[in-house]
């Protein structure tokens, strides 16, 4: 099953509480109601925890490079891409784009 991971930050001027309200009331319900999405979850990253390698080079950053991670399990990727090309899909992305930094990255992967 295709899985999309999105790592992102909010725009500097975005109020985190306002964004979390948007997530809870608009984005999460809309994503979970879409027939082409099996599951959708978002995590807020709290802090840098530890190095991944036993002997890291240099000092760990004090702030995570991204503060949010979303995971979308997609039943039909073509249907999702098709929806995003519609007026409704464009409006949905536009409503999210108000909050997120333009360095947002979408990645596509699969379970191993």
Protein language model features and the residues they cover:
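Macromolecular interaction modules
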Residues: 1-112
